[in-house]
A protein has these predicted regions:
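Residue-level recognition of phosphate/Mg2+-coordinating polar/acidic sites
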Residues: 1-12, 69-73, 79, 130-264
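Conserved N-terminal/central alpha/beta ligand/cofactor-binding core
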Residues: 1-38, 43
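Positions that flank functional sites
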Residues: 13, 47, 107-108, 246
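Electropositive phosphate-/nucleotide-binding environments in soluble metabolic enzymes
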Residues: 18, 22, 26, 82, ...
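Core beta-strand elements of the Rossmann-like FAD/NAD(P) dinucleotide-binding domain
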Residues: 40, 59-69, 137-140
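A conserved short coil-to-beta-strand element within the FAD-binding core of flavoproteins
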Residues: 41-53
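Glycine-rich loop(s) and the adjacent beta-strand/alpha-helix scaffold that form part
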Residues: 69-115
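Acidic, Ser/Thr/Pro-rich intrinsically disordered regulatory segments
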Residues: 110-142
Length: 264
């Protein structure tokens, strides 16, 4: 309420420049307090008593919560330094409610870069690319990190990569470095140029060219058609997702099939 916002290129809603996250949080808190909401801080949910009632603990010690209805909004397990330790599923397991283990969701991916790539290009962006994994695909930007890739083009395909890693132990990320051009158009741009001029002809930057050299056979860089095919489908082996503690969000917790129609 009373927070001026705008919609970014990603479709997400952001506060306008000059408004800090703490300001937004304060406005939300004020709105809730005006509606009679009471916020109790420094309380920890520690489990259930023998009657199935929630048990909490504060500086006075443990106590049982008496309520007609309790809504649990316990969060995931990313960024544990903020308090999201992810231990609550075990408390539900103890009363017979099944849960799925937490896994990283919106997160970076691990790729075993050759040392020269990581050293020379960590921190550099891969702009205006399309990435694909399984049936998922996304346009956007990815940043090369010391450990792999991260960014808004990567996060939408993480579920497909996670499935492949869990099922097969490995996964492949497909990158189209020039989604605005077909293979044929790229070949025409190269024309009769020498291989050493291929990258310049199609406007590849140094980071893009470094990835092509690292993950495609050298002989393919000598053929215009093969070089352009690799530009349109650069395949990178994904070894893992980045740790859950680095993830923006997580999946896991109580599955929908464990809930009744009234979410109890």
């Amino acid at each position: 309420r009373n927070v001026e916002t705008f919609i970014g290129s990603s479709g997400r809603v952001f506060p306008v420049k000059g408004i800090k996250p703490i300001d937004v949080l304060a406005r939300i808190r004020e709105h809730l307090m005006e509606r009679g909401v009471r916020i109790h801080v420094e309380h920890v949910f520690t489990g259930f008593d023998e009657a199935g009632r929630p048990v909490l603990e504060n500086h006075n010690g443990p106590f049982t919560l008496e309520a007609d209805r309790v809504i649990f909004a316990l969060g995931g397990a990313s960024w544990p330094v903020t308090g999201s330790t992810g231990i609550w599923p075990s408390l539900f397991n103890a009363i017979g409610i099944a849960t799925h283990p937490f896994e990283a969701s919106n997160c970076g991916i691990a790729i075993a870069w050759p040392e020269p790539v990581a050293k020379a290009h960590a921190g550099k962006p891969l702009k205006n690319i399309r990435v694909s994994a399984g049936d998922e695909s996304a346009l956007g930007e990815a940043t090369i990190t010391a450990h792999g890739l991260e960014g808004n083009a990567i996060y939408p395909v993480v579920p497909a990569l996670r499935t492949a890693l869990n099922e097969a132990g490995h996964a492949t990320l497909h990158i189209d470095l020039k989604p605005g051009n077909t293979t044929e158009e790229l070949v025409r741009k190269i024309g009769a140029k020498e291989p050493r001029n291929f990258a310049e002809a199609v406007h590849l930057d140094r980071a893009q060219l470094a990835l092509l050299k690292a993950f495609t056979p050298k002989e393919r860089s000598m053929s215009a058609s093969a070089f352009c095919e690799d530009i349109k489908d650069l395949r990178l082996p994904v070894t893992a997702l980045r740790p859950i503690g680095e993830a923006i969000s997580t999946v896991g917790g109580i599955p929908t099939e464990a809930l009744s129609s009234d979410f109890s």
